[in-house]
């Protein structure tokens, strides 16, 4: 089994690491006081992170689950809050629609979720 990351995964890791350090780290104290990171999530949507595993046909980045885990790891290094938000958004909000939704539901919900315009939650 080859456990090395692909070039694409390494580039994505570096991008997420820079984003977390530059954009999330300065906001951590506010989040710890209860401020929800809406602007950060919108920026994550612009970067393709909110739809990292969603196919491009539905507005996502179309990346694999290894990339998704790398992204969560890099985000969580700076803020567990943001890492958990992405995890829940993807695993509870987006993936059930992607895997079990009708085509009509996919068309209606996946693009706004993938773009970070809607947030998936419990």
Regions found by a protein language model. Give the residues of each.
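Intrinsic disorder at enzyme termini
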Residues: 1-8
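A non-catalytic, amphipathic alpha-helix used as a structural packing/dimerization or gating element
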Residues: 11-22
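Glycine-rich flavin
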Residues: 24-122
């Amino acid at each position: 089994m080859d456990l090395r990351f692909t070039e694409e995964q390494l580039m994505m890791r570096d991008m997420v690491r820079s984003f977390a350090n530059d954009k999330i780290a300065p906001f951590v104290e506010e989040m710890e006081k209860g401020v929800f990171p809406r602007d950060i999530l919108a920026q994550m949507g612009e970067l393709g992170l909110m739809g990292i595993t969603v196919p491009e046909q539905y507005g996502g980045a179309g990346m694999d689950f290894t990339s998704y885990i790398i992204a969560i790891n890099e985000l969580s290094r700076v803020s567990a809050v943001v890492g958990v938000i992405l995890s829940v958004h993807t695993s509870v909000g987006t993936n059930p629609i992607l895997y079990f939704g009708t085509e009509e539901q996919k068309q209606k919900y996946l693009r706004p979720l993938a773009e970070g315009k809607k947030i998936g939650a419990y």
